[in-house]
């Protein structure tokens, strides 16, 4: 019996042109997919953290997105400061009375079917060979390398426990 192979650590970081093309494709895709992926790029949050977000977790007045411990990978509550651009995206989302989720196609459950949507996004954007989690890694890399944010702060933004930006989980 062979031992299990080591899991390959992904290190794909999207360059700025790729991010720009994905952003433009998101504009074409519209609700719910476009805004989900744009918020991933702006916040560095995990796909499920954004796609399953509820209105009660977001405060435009405070500019925050409060994730309860039950919805984070490390089971620690996390507050994400929303940029003006992220707040504007959230403010433009359809708001239906009685609907608790930011992103839903049926009014009651969070969106699903990401692999199908990812294929569509690849076609529209012309960017291939990446995964949704690469948006998070790209956020971390560009924050530290281009914006000069300290890796310790980047880890806090990403709700990391370890203090390592590499191998973004």
Where are these regions (language model features)?
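Basic, Lys/Arg- and aromatic-enriched nucleic-acid-binding interface segment
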Residues: 1-53, 61, 72-76, 96-97, ...
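Catalytic-site neighborhood detector that most strongly recognizes the C-terminal catalytic loop/helix
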Residues: 4-7, 13, 67-75, 87, ...
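Active-site/catalytic core of tyrosine-dependent DNA strand-transfer enzymes
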Residues: 13-19, 62, 71, 81-128, ...
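Alpha-helical structural elements of signaling/regulatory helical domains
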Residues: 28-32, 95, 127, 146-149
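C-terminal catalytic core of tyrosine-transesterase DNA break-rejoin enzymes
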Residues: 38, 42-49, 120, 134-163
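Short, polar N-cap/turn motifs at the start of nucleic acid-interacting alpha helices
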Residues: 57-64, 128-129, 148-169
């Amino acid at each position: 019996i062979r031992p299990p192979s080591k899991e390959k650590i992904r290190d794909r970081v999207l360059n700025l042109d790729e991010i720009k093309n994905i952003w433009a494709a998101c504009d074409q895709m519209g609700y719910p997919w476009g805004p989900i992926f744009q918020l991933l790029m702006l916040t560095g949050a995990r796909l499920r953290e954004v796609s399953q977000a509820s209105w009660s977790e977001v405060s435009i007045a405070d500019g925050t997105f409060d994730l309860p411990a039950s919805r984070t990978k490390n089971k620690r509550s996390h507050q994400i400061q929303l940029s003006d651009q992220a707040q504007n995206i959230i403010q433009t989302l359809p708001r239906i009375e009685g609907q608790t989720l930011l992103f839903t196609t049926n009014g009651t459950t969070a969106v699903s079917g990401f692999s199908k949507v990812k294929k569509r996004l690849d076609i529209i954007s012309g960017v291939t060979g990446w995964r949704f989690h690469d948006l998070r890694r790209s956020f971390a890399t560009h924050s530290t390398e281009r914006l000069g944010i300290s890796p310790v702060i980047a880890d806090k933004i990403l709700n990391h426990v370890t203090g390592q930006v590499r191998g973004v989980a």
